Amino acid sequence: MRAKDAVGRYGEDVAAAHVEARGWRVLDRNWRCRYGELDLVGMDGDVLVVVEVKTRRSTAYGTPAEAVTWRKLARIRRLAAQWLTEHDVRASSVRVDVIAIVLPHAGAAQVEHLQGVC
């Protein structure tokens, strides 16, 4: 596994633990279809939440959240609709969150959870 892939995978593990610690139920991780991939899908109460996870080793080139563009968010919304057509899940609404993770050389991961970004 490439170092970049390992960092991303670790970040997704941190994000899943983060939302589970807040009482979410994780429904899917790394769900793929021909249109793209969703990093994390979960239920926050009765709200279906689709999460884009961005992980970086530093903020030298900007924060991880800054890497999530409006174009990417539009794609995530389309993928969320596709996910819902393929899964029998009832939700009062759908929300898109971004979890931005910085992995410093020493110490714990820094997690920023941005809720309802679109």
What does each model-found stretch correspond to?
Residues 60-92:
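Mid-chain, well-packed structural core segment of small domains
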Residues 1-29:
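Acidic-basic catalytic patches of nuclease active cores, encompassing PD-(D/E)XK
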Residues 30, 39-41, 54-56, 99-102, ...:
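Anionic group-transfer/hydrolysis microenvironments
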Residues 25, 48, 93:
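Hydrophobic "anchor" residues on beta-strands that sit immediately upstream
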Residues 86-118:
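Domain-level recognition of nuclease-like catalytic cores that cleave nucleotide substrates
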Residues 19, 38-64, 68, 76:
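Conserved catalytic cores of phosphodiester-cleaving nucleases, focusing on short active-site segments
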Residues 34-36:
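Short acidic/glycine-enriched loop/turn segments that link adjacent beta-strands
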